[in-house]
Regions:
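Phosphate/pyrophosphate-binding loops and the adjoining catalytic core of nucleotide-dependent enzymes
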Residues: 17
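Active-site beta->alpha loop and helix N-cap motifs at the rims of alpha/beta catalytic domains
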Residues: 1-12
């Protein structure tokens, strides 16, 4: 799969690649808004592929949602509001709540009429992929982002040590559904405390793009030294 970041510059590339029959991993998704644009880009690309008589059944794509980084960032902001009892109660809950809202959007989009028409012509859903699912805060369960992110038609690129821990003491049970009322309540509570989830996600995206650019530059430099 070609890996393309979920940025304003990336959405057009995603559609174009899919229209040309190329599998795509849309990465660095943090916010619900990014996910919506990602799914739209997928549908647009598949529509163009089908219009050109392409083979929709050969296409696979995932929407990679980064999880634990959101809790790391949100928890730091919540720690600054320690005098407010509600702040402490929200720690460690923001990332999964955000993921639940994204999954709800996924179920709505891919159960809709637009995709169902494509599905009859061989198209597969663009699966949601949970990334960055290793637990970074030792105060949380070592399998937190596995047990709390089990949902139909999703993928979890779990670190090996987390997988081993889950095999040791985890339970396979669906924990995310299309019902996201509780998740919405958590995000609303965060907003009431003056923390904007969209701003948090925007900063994480910016940081992620910079890290990707640095990795790419390092790769090019390494290749140049070999030639």
């Amino acid at each position: 799969m070609f890996k393309v970041p979920a940025t304003d510059a990336g959405y057009g590339a995603i559609s174009a690649l899919l229209a040309d029959g190329i599998n795509v991993n849309v990465t660095l998704i943090f916010s619900l808004e990014q996910y919506k644009k990602t799914a739209t880009a997928y549908l647009e690309g598949m529509a163009r592929l089908l219009k050109n008589n392409g083979d929709a059944s050969s296409i696979r794509s995932v929407a990679s949602v980064f999880v634990s980084r959101i809790d790391t960032a949100a928890d730091k902001l919540l720690d600054q509001l320690q005098e407010q009892q509600e702040a402490a109660s929200l720690k460690g809950k923001i990332a999964v709540a955000n993921s639940n809202l994204i999954y709800r959007e996924y179920t709505e989009i891919f159960s809709g009429d637009e995709f169902k028409k494509m599905e009859k012509k061989g198209a597969s859903v663009q699966r949601v992929l949970w990334g960055s699912t290793g637990t970074k805060n030792p105060a949380y369960s070592d399998i937190k982002y596995m047990t709390e992110l089990i949902a139909r038609n999703t993928v979890n690129t779990v670190p090996e040590n987390t997988l081993e821990a889950f095999l040791d003491h985890g339970t396979v049970q669906e924990t995310i559904t299309a019902d996201a009322k509780e998740a919405q309540g958590i995000i609303d509570a965060l907003q009431r405390l003056g923390i904007d989830i969209n701003a948090v996600c925007a900063q994480l995206l910016e940081d992620g793009v910079v890290a990707f650019e640095q990795s790419f530059d390092s790769l090019l430099n390494a290749i140049e030294k070999k030639t």
